[in-house]
Amino acid sequence: MANNIGLDFGTTYSVISRIKQLDRDETGKVIKCELEACLPGEGVLSPCQDSLVLKKNDNSLEFGSLARESTGRKGSILYKGFKMMLAETDEKVLKARGYTHEYTPERIIKEFIDDILKKYMETYQIDGNLDKVVIGVPEIWFKKVSTIDCRTKLENIVSSLPYVNKVELVSEPAAACAYFVNNFKKENHYSFKGKVLIIDYGGGTLDIALCDVREKGEFSEVSVMERCGAGLNEEGYIGKAGVAFIEEIVKLALSPTGLSGNEIINNRKFYKCAASVENALMLKMKDIKNTFDFVEIFNRESINDEFYSIEFDDEPYSVTYGMLAKAYNKVISPVLGQKLGEMLDYINTHNITVDKIISVGGFCNFYLTQAQIEDAFARGAGDSRFSDAISDKRECEKAISYGAALIAEDIISFKHLSPYYLGFGKGSDKELKKAYYIIKKGDVIDCDKPVFVKNPDGTDTLFIAKKIPLFVFNLDDSCEKESALWGEPLGEYQKMLELRPLESWQRYKLGISLDKSMIITLHKQIVDVNNPNEVYEEGHVRLDEIYAILGNMIEERRN
């Protein structure tokens, strides 16, 4: 079996998983598939590794739990949530978070992923290179124009590691759904078909996605129909997810100190307090459920029973159950309710029947989160939408890495749908007169296969160098707002493709392809005008930074 792994590169935690055992019969049918979430080292109990990097005053770096334990040392800088910093271009924001021209988000990410991959290879005695690393990324990275470059940057970062042969990105909800599909078949002995709603609530993000699962021969195929979300992947900061909830609990508990919220968070002892509260939330899930089960919702904030005690400046401070409810109602409940409402509106508007509702991510294990989700969908006794899903709730936080591992081994396939409209357009440098879309949003993509511009009769459209059309890029369902290369970006694109004047009997064929990570490649062929199937020269250019290429032009055209 190849050295393939799935990586959940999370905002707050990261998990590596692999297929420990894979048995097939003589026809190739999978008869046994055993997944394993990999521990980062001997003696470590959890596969979940803190997505933290600490730069010490001597410029050396510490990672994960070591970084957490060393937080607050004089002259040190703690980097967290760095995955989402890939989309940040504001120098002031980057500087405020400790980034410099030397220690960029890209470098911190590379150092962190290099560390966890090497630990995995050492712990599990992996000889040779990693054949394929499939990484779960937020679904919004496939949808929101300002985060599109995050995919190419992350893929390039991991691909640059000399021991990684191939990198593929997949949306986190699709990966979680892949794990559910595999788990369903394992427990029920038949394949699942239908609509699955994935609610992924982690430490930094909320991602809600409606997935469609279909049979494809012996295997299953997953596609994402609709999504919405909140948190670091939406607003650009951790404000609507598990980390913010824990921070709010600590601030409430330490309010008797007289310190402000910012003073508490910036105190070097804060992260140890937060870590102890987080551990208590995981260890006392049954106590939380038993306490809140018998109290009306509107009375929960007034519960003074102690949940846990934290130590700050050598003094104990009580965390009450009422504080848990108050923090939840302030930080989590409003936005979770809003986003669940948005998804329900979509489901009802399109008359969609949801067959399964699955909660993944560590924060979905919290009782109040579970209760709010169930209330939103009016869960009743014996509700089949919530049953036969992921029976062991401890596996929820590993679902994305498990699904990525299954996709890495091609046990579950992912139906690739174009997240945007792509094509060519006619016009001048200052005006796009008409757009010709050759790939439409929602089209099923044959990955890495170029689609060329066609005439209405189905024949190939041929171009001469002086009449090369603009490249059109569009995220709008209505196609009313096109974004096209023009001026300097157009010149750069023509230069990259090496478009030049041709002989009188030659013409260009132009096309576009998308890879499995939905990264765009432009293609050219030089053909004989009298025999378009006769190709004299081919070339292509991968648009690694499409947002940077389009840049201000997008904003200008949409104003």
Where are these regions (language model features)?
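Phosphate-binding loop and its immediate beta->loop->alpha context
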Residues: 26-156, 161, 241-298, 549-559
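Adenine-nucleotide phosphate-binding core of ATP-dependent small-molecule kinases
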Residues: 95-121, 311-347, 452-453, 462-465, ...
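Glycine-rich phosphate-binding loops at beta-strand->alpha-helix junctions
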Residues: 133-150, 331, 351-376, 392-397
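Acidic, glycine/GT-rich loop-and beta-edge segments that sit at the periphery of enzyme/chaperone cores
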Residues: 11, 261-262, 383-499
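Gly/Thr-rich phosphate-binding beta-strand-loop-beta motif of the actin/hexokinase/Hsp70
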Residues: 2-26, 184-224, 508-525
